[in-house]
Amino acid sequence: MKIKIDESYLSKLEQLALIRLKNEEKDKISNDLQRIIDFFEKINELELKDVEPLFHPISSGKLRKDEPLKPLNRDEALQNVKRKENGYIVGPRTYGE
């Protein structure tokens, strides 16, 4: 089924997204959406009947064995820290002044 992004379809998308587009935005978005839809239609045309589905793109994992290392002591951990205070790392404020 060929989907065509026309004025009514775009208007419905505006309502669903709760947005209002300007006319110049409508033209650009309409063209972009049509290109995306066309791309997915090309994907749908692929013959995949004999292709076995993959659960992961890499068939065999090459994982390294976990080996515990000696933990850093406090001085080593704070060695490259820009801001520290009383043996703790001081990070940037994320809330308030």
Curated annotation (Swiss-Prot):
SUPFAM superfamilies linked: Glu-tRNAGln amidotransferase C subunit
Record family assignment: Belongs to the GatC family.
Signal sequence, start to end: none
Gene3D superfamilies per UniProt: Glu-tRNAGln amidotransferase C subunit, N-terminal domain
GO MF entry, a single one: ATP binding
EC number assigned by the record: 6.3.5.-
Catalytic reaction equation(s): L-glutamyl-tRNA(Gln) + L-glutamine + ATP + H2O = L-glutaminyl-tRNA(Gln) + L-glutamate + ADP + phosphate + H(+); L-aspartyl-tRNA(Asn) + L-glutamine + ATP + H2O = L-asparaginyl-tRNA(Asn) + L-glutamate + ADP + phosphate + 2 H(+)
Superkingdom: Archaea
InterPro entries, per the entry: Asp/Glu-ADT_sf_sub_c (IPR036113), GatC (IPR003837)
Keyword annotations: ATP-binding, Ligase, Nucleotide-binding, Protein biosynthesis
A biological-process GO annotation: regulation of translational fidelity
Pfam family, one: GatC
Subunit structure: Heterotrimer of A, B and C subunits.
Main enzyme class: ligase
Function: Allows the formation of correctly charged Asn-tRNA(Asn) or Gln-tRNA(Gln) through the transamidation of misacylated Asp-tRNA(Asn) or Glu-tRNA(Gln) in organisms which lack either or both of asparaginyl-tRNA or glutaminyl-tRNA synthetases. The reaction takes place in the presence of glutamine and ATP through an activated phospho-Asp-tRNA(Asn) or phospho-Glu-tRNA(Gln).
Classification lineage: Archaea, Thermoproteota, Thermoprotei, Sulfolobales, Sulfolobaceae
PANTHER family according to UniProt: GLUTAMYL-TRNA(GLN) AMIDOTRANSFERASE SUBUNIT C, MITOCHONDRIAL (PTHR15004:SF0)
Name of the protein described by the UniProt record: Aspartyl/glutamyl-tRNA(Asn/Gln) amidotransferase subunit C
